């Protein structure tokens, strides 16, 4: 059995971002955790999917959320 695709997604928000962003993130299939953070990024989501296509699909859903400005995907290597 192949390993799951795992990634940390760092998210930059627009000022007009949704107040329930974390709840919207956690509702997306494949997202294991999400939270607002301080620093150069505004939020993060940890993602686990069966394959790269699932990871891409999850990332597309994150980017479609109102107020998401940009994302940075950090794939795990081990």
Regions found by a protein language model. Name each.
Residues 1-78:
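A compositional/biophysical signature of low hydrophobicity enriched in polar/charged and small residues
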């Amino acid at each position: 059995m192949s390993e799951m695709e795992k990634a940390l997604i760092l998210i930059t928000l627009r000022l007009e971002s949704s107040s329930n962003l974390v709840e919207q993130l956690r509702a997306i299939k494949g997202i294991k955790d999400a939270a607002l953070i301080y620093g150069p990024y505004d939020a993060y989501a940890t993602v686990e999917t069966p394959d790269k296509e699932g990871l891409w699909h999850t990332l597309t859903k994150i980017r479609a959320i109102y107020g998401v400005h940009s994302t940075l995907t950090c794939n795990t290597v081990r």
